[in-house]
Amino acid sequence: IRKSKISESNYFYIPSLSITTIIYKGIIMPEDIGPYYKDLQEIDLVTRLALVHQRFSTNTMPTWELAQPFRHMCQNGEINTLRGNVSRMRVREEIMKSDVFGPQIDKLFPIILPGKSDSASMDMVVELLTHTGRSLPEIMMMMIPEAWEKHKTMSKERKAFYEYNGCIMEPWDGPASVPFTDGDYIGALLDRNGLRPSRYTVTKSGKLIMSSEIGVVDVAPEDVKEHGRLEPGKMFLVDMN
C-alpha cells in the first residue's frame, strides 16, 4: 500500500495485526479515550494487562500514526543517538537476507520510514527483530544495554551477551524509560544513566502498577505490599504465562 499509487497512501497505518494485543490510540485527551472507543465501555471487555501512554509530542507534529503506544512499545524520554541508529539500519538493508521473503525482501525497505519520531523508529526495529526468533525482553536488552563494559561484578555470561549483541546492534541511547509488551511479556527498561523516573507498586490484592511516578493509579495505603523503582540499565519484567 505504501508503495502503491493510491491517493493519500502515505496516511495509511495499521496499528497492529497481533492476536495477543489490541491498540487504542488517538490525538485526544486521556479522559476521552473511553467514550471514543465504544468497546472500552463494554463491561464484558477484560484484560490481564494494559500499557498506557499519555503525553504531548515535543519533537514531531502530532499525527495519529505517531501517537503512542506503538505495536510493541512506548517511550518516556528521547533517543539521542537516533540519526546514527537510522543510518546504520539503512546500511544493514544492503546485506539483509530472509528465507521467507527471498529476493522480495527489498519490499520491506526502508525498515525505518522517513520522517518518523524516535519512538516510532525504534518500534519499527523492534518489530523487525521479533521476526528473527528473538524474545521481546532479549530484543530490548540488545537495543538498550546496561553499562556493562567496566562492570566488575557482572557475570561473564551476561557480559558475553552484551558483547555479542553489540556486534549486531548498536545502543539506542538517551534518557528514556521504555515500557513494552507483546501480550505474553510486559515490562520496562530504563536507560543506563537512569535519567527518567520509573516506579512500581505491588498490591496485596494482586495488582502490579508501574509508571513514571507513584500515584498515577489510586491504591489504598493498606493495600500496598511493596514500592520500588527501576534502577539504571535494569529491566522490570512480568511473564504473563
Predicted regions and their residues:
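Conserved short alpha-helical segments that host acidic/polar catalytic motifs at enzyme active sites
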Residues: 1-241
